[in-house]
Amino acid sequence: MTTEYLDEERDLPLPRQKKGIDHTQTEPIRGFFGVKDMFAFENVGFTRSSEGKRYLVCGECEQGPVGFVDPVTEMNYVSPERLDVLPDVAAAAVEAGK
């Protein structure tokens, strides 16, 4: 399994949207771990395409999004920040899995 770290900032929709607002509220998130096969992540599902974008969600509670699918490369990226995992801990886990 090939894993990569994407050190870029991307806007992800907020997990909870305020009512009465006519657009999707987002927040900038920096740093994502990516794999080609989304099933390499435990308990991750994906949303239907919205505005040409697909997002990854928790497979157990369906909270999210916790990441996104790159439409060009079809890589699946999750944010350690959204998973409450420290980037150093996640990086060590990825390194150990190589």
Curated annotation (Swiss-Prot):
UniProt-recorded Gene Ontology molecular function terms: guanyl-nucleotide exchange factor activity; zinc ion binding
BP term (GO), one: post-Golgi vesicle-mediated transport
Keyword Protein transport: yes
UniProt-listed Pfam families: Mss4 (PF04421)
Keywords: Guanine-nucleotide releasing factor, Protein transport, Transport
Biased composition (Acidic residues): 1-10
PROSITE patterns referenced in this protein's UniProt entry, alphabetically: MSS4 (PS51796)
Organism superkingdom: Eukaryota
Domain MSS4: 1-86
GO cellular component term of the entry, any: cytosol
Homology family: Belongs to the DSS4/MSS4 family.
Protein name stated in the entry: Putative guanine nucleotide exchange factor MSS4 homolog
